[in-house]
């Protein structure tokens, strides 16, 4: 595989593949040759530095890297998360065909469907008012308490599908900072609030600390007996959940073959289901399942996750780009960049290969972003004229949900397309100078000012276009990026499904708590940590 990477590097250099502007000038049909569609979802990658030769080499790279074989292992329940000896089967959670999926010889689909049915029954009960609070009032507010995958997915998807909300209001608490839960509790009434505690082990310190605060909120206002009417849990630790005071009928489980950052499809999606209803949640699963089938069956040049993953690898390990910007032109996708940040960086932020040797080249990039057009007035300046090349990924729907605001949506579309065009085309010195002199500036001053108005262009971008951000479309988009991360992880030769860096942070925080509380000396820690503990201790009131 290293030989192919070297060949890609030499081919990119020899063909001047990074001159995207010249490629468009030479080929009027470039868009049609370097774009692909799956139903209404269009992926335009013509503004990246690829050509026919590079695509052929990338296809060989996927073959030599064993992407197809590893893909089938994942879908069939092989324990590809070998450091934890676990299968990776978030795809089973949205397996709408109900084709058997075996883990250790057992079909998991009956259990998956059983939990989904229980979620639907509970969600319907809350939404209809059949399941009430302790005083007999209907639930009007749902607060999900979780962190990481137990928070980012539900937050992102619930916000994204706001036009489909017809259930109780939704809130989310994640940070152990007491300000987070305090600010939200001010907005709700104990009598009409349901808390969902999302923690597989029911031991996550941030989640359980906030859960205890929520429990105190209910018990203080309504009494201990009210707790069972105002809480539900997504967990597998039934004994701990029972000790907390949550009825077993309100506990929804999931499995160790579901990673946190892939868990929105599981019972972790309960707050989303309550917000939009079981039918729309089912359409959300349908969209992801459709992308799963596309990923498994579509030929290379039509396979969106395969193309996206290979171009991502090409940007990272051939052209050396260290970061990628996620730029959805949809305010309701405002948390999508953060969601992808966890999905990508927690999965592919690894330095050791599946053989236990150091990664050669690079692993995952830094992933970040904001919705357009907000980002245009913040960091786009650096993307356009900075010294680092940052591949951008735009997303735009053809239609919004506010027909009376169609003109605003057209402005949004125009801004999105203009940014991708500007990144590719740039502006030469001659063009900049001509623009200045046409406005009356003299030649000498124009020569001085024009360099500041030069844009080098050749900044790569990918643009996704789709009809409308429906539950189906959102599920499809998330699954597309999940599979993109998978493809890149296989090519990086890493395990994309563990997260030992996260575990390290938990261990160290647990060890430091007694020091922060003043129960133990800081002497065993480095001088910086000792100094910081002392400074904070001095400021405590």
Swiss-Prot record:
Biological process according to GO: gluconeogenesis; glucose 6-phosphate metabolic process; glycolytic process
Similarity comment text for this entry: Belongs to the GPI family.
Top EC class, one word: isomerase
Organism: Rhizobium rhizogenes (strain K84 / ATCC BAA-868)
GO CC term (a single one): cytosol
Stored HAMAP family: G6P_isomerase (MF_00473)
SUPFAM superfamilies, per database record: SIS domain (SSF53697)
Residue numbers annotated as active site: 346, 377, 506
Record-given protein name: Glucose-6-phosphate isomerase
Known function: Catalyzes the reversible isomerization of glucose-6-phosphate to fructose-6-phosphate.
EC number(s) stated in the UniProt entry for this protein: 5.3.1.9
GO molecular function terms attached to this record: carbohydrate derivative binding; glucose-6-phosphate isomerase activity; monosaccharide binding
Transmembrane parts of this sequence: none
Main localization (coarse): cytoplasm
Pathway the protein takes part in: Carbohydrate biosynthesis; gluconeogenesis; Carbohydrate degradation; glycolysis; D-glyceraldehyde 3-phosphate and glycerone phosphate from D-glucose: step 2/4
Reaction it catalyzes: alpha-D-glucose 6-phosphate = beta-D-fructose 6-phosphate
Short name of any one Pfam family annotated for the protein: PGI
Keywords: Cytoplasm, Gluconeogenesis, Glycolysis, Isomerase
Keyword Cytoplasm: yes
Subcellular location: Cytoplasm
Keyword Cell inner membrane on entry: no
